[in-house]
Amino acid sequence: MKKQQNQGLDFIIDKLTNSIHNVVTGDSFATDISLLTASDLKNVIKKNKWQFDWRFEFKQPQRDVYKLTIVNNQSVIQGLISLEIKSDHVYMHLVESAPFNKGKTKVYAGVPGNLVAFA
């Protein structure tokens, strides 16, 4: 039997991958995922209704915390994910949508899916 060569991954997970959409208008917005910075930490705190201690996650040397933002609007964090890269898998410690992207009044849909797809 002839061995097939690995072609890589080239598929769409869902209609929202690499974008999120406004639940009111239905408009879709392209997204970026980048590393969380120390200056970002002042905004992702429990006082601002974030559920998890992202400062703690950020300080863990074996973990990387990534933020999801809308292209051309990097100052507003839509969601966060904490990842640890192992030799045989990726461990997701935490995933959280921004407070304004939760529940019945959320602004954007697709945030967790984008973060998990990135992982």
Regions found by a protein language model. Give the residues of each.
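Non-catalytic substrate-recognition and accessory regions of acyl/acetyltransferase enzymes
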Residues: 1-110, 114
